[in-house]
Amino acid sequence: MRLSQYFLPLLKENPKEAEIVSHRFMLRAGMIRQQTSGIYSWLPLGKKVLDKVCKIIREEQERAGAIEILMPTIQSADLWRESGRYDDYGLEMLRIKDRQKRDLLYGPTNEEMVTDIFRSYVRSYKDLPLNLYHIQWKFRDEIRPRFGVMRAREFLMKDAYSFDLDYEGSKTSYNRMFVAYLRTFSRLGLKAIPMRADTGPIGGKLSHEFIILAETGESAIFCDKQFLELSVPNSSIDFSDKAVLDDTVKQWTSFYAATEEMHNEEEWARLSEENRLSARGIEVGHIFHFGTKYSAPMEAKVMGQDGKEHVVSMGSYGIGPSRLVAAAIEASHDEKGIIWPKSMAPFDFGIINMKPDDEKCTQACEFLYQGLKDAGFDPFLDDRNERPGSKFATMDLIGLPTQIIVGPNSIAHNEVEIKDRKTGAKKSLKVEDVLSQLSIL
């Protein structure tokens, strides 16, 4: 993409309404625009990042055996009355009536609807286990929406729901999603630590939230430093192997880890001083095992091998892609702007033409731009007739991992400068060597 043809509404000054780093940089980099309190439009640069996050989430959900569906944002209140949650959810849930005076709601979550889908079609234990997921916009009427998309009223969520014949089967499904989440966050360039969590209004007795470390995080966290050394399962992991899943989850839950709400001073005191890590973190995922909380009142049953009806055991698994984008910025930035992990960056490489009216500079930029595209990359060429300083500031702000700087002095020696956004390290390469060198990064 050429910046001269792109819609990138940058802001030079820090917006007054932005309280945290991610909100400030997302507004300044033209990723989002606030439409009203807690509700945002995603502009082209932000949408590209959001799409990349969703792509990796989908790949890992499907690797773990989940099947994608799409449920509507508007739900019938009758389903929520059936589960008993309609009155429990308070003012956060937006309740509406249609012209026929029927009670509807803008879904804050989808346990009831997916259970209704399941009970309408699934009759036999032979169809289990089953895991259905979707990625859809949700709405919760926060009292005080703040921090940009980190705590918005409308937000994008990936929700998965597992159905099993019994508790043991549903525990395996829970572990399967636990491991899928470890892989998802790792592929997004984030180190997520699973922590025992309160089940809240979702319900159930088992829950973990996944926290990434960030100095500006909203939660105080306490954990064993050994978490930082654990390796995430690679793509060869067998999600059908119960023993492998159990061992992986056991390894990742054997060390102490807790948010402030679940912190236990006695257990913390048993840790050696050198292994204690007290920091700030941001929740990026939450998984729940709630058994028959929804399936029992909604009569979601299957016929078992014994010829008897069994109420299915369920779990739900959430990741907020829109929140995840902001969390990644909180975890990786400097005073100049965003520093994207490669897997989340809106473009693979940024090319800066320092002097567009110089024929050799422009020829080199076109050669590199087209060569990268032909090699399957998605480059971003700043071909505007602007000052070099402005171009450097733009490229640092939007956070592309690798910058290719083409100026008249270096191009006179048939060279360009390669800059690593994270480290600031620079090196010179011959123009003809750039494509082969960047392809192995």
From Swiss-Prot:
Keywords: Aminoacyl-tRNA synthetase, ATP-binding, Cytoplasm, Ligase, Nucleotide-binding, Protein biosynthesis. Its EC number is 6.1.1.15. One of its GO terms (cellular component) is cytosol. GO terms for molecular function: ATP binding; proline-tRNA ligase activity. It catalyses: tRNA(Pro) + L-proline + ATP = L-prolyl-tRNA(Pro) + AMP + diphosphate. Pfam families: HGTP_anticodon (PF03129), tRNA-synt_2b (PF00587). One of its GO terms (biological process) is prolyl-tRNA aminoacylation. CDD domains: ProRS_anticodon_short, ProRS_core_prok. Its main location: cytoplasm. The keyword Iron-sulfur does not apply. It is found in: Cytoplasm. It comes from the Bacteria. Belongs to the class-II aminoacyl-tRNA synthetase family. ProS type 2 subfamily. NCBIfam families: PRK12325.1, proS_fam_II. PANTHER family: MITOCHONDRIAL RIBOSOME PROTEIN L39/PROLYL-TRNA LIGASE FAMILY MEMBER, PROLINE--TRNA LIGASE. Homodimer. Catalyzes the attachment of proline to tRNA(Pro) in a two-step reaction: proline is first activated by ATP to form Pro-AMP and then transferred to the acceptor end of tRNA(Pro). This is Proline--tRNA ligase. The lineage of its organism: Bacteria, Pseudomonadati, Pseudomonadota, Alphaproteobacteria, Hyphomicrobiales.
